[in-house]
Amino acid sequence: AAAARIIEETFPELLEENGGMREDGKAEESEGKQGNGEMPESEGKQGNREKPEILPVVNESGEVIGRAERKEVHQKGLWHPVVHCWMYAKQDDQIWFYFQKRSEIKDDFPGYYDIGSTGHVADQETAQEAVMREAEEEMGIRVEKDRLHYLGTVKEEMDINGCNDREIAQVYLYHLDIPFFAPGEEVSEVIAVSKEELEKKELENAPYIQGHSLCGEPVFLRAKEWCCHEGEYQKLVMPFFAERGIG
């Protein structure tokens, strides 16, 4: 049923092992709001770090050619590495993807829905290390390496109000055994979307799709409420499932 309590009914063992779910299925939201959908001018994720955040700078082939402060990287449009981690769980014949709703404290795209976890690769950090760190910071998941699949790379470019964001994303897919989340302060909510509904958005350009909160309530997700990762699902995620005959 559309309003089924996905976590409670589909994964009852989750509640048994973790003592139940919060009624609202959310992490507590931090007070105050920052940002308006513009690229961040802050040095770190929340703009309050004592030291500037240093990022590796790469060429268009992804080779590291230097390092620079995050602010400089965005202002000058320097290519830099990031990670995207799609998350899914499988129950019977149904595949569910899990997406985050970005907190209102985020400098860029607050309140938008996005891939399970995303983030910059830090200086002297590998992409796999970055994926594992971001998944734990944002979604409260300790990644098991044997469930983490590397899919490939995509390039993304955005020019917003004078800031140029040029990223080379290392894309991963993580198979959740039991979809239990403990979102950090940068994530206000986790949403479950069936593969069927997701493909209405990705393949048919549907104006909205239906997802569910973690306590099973239906949520209608408009296309304009999503961060844009155009073609990533079709290019990298779909082939993974097709090659393995999943879903």
Each language-model region and where it sits:
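Internal, conserved structured core segments that host functional sites
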Residues: 136-140, 157
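Long, intrinsically disordered low-complexity tandem-repeat segments
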Residues: 30-48
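Residues that flank catalytic or metal-binding motifs in active/ligand-binding sites
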Residues: 53, 81-83, 117, 150, ...
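A short coil-to-beta-strand element that immediately follows conserved catalytic motifs
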Residues: 142-152
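Nudix hydrolase/Nudix homology domain
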Residues: 4, 8-22, 111, 152-159, ...
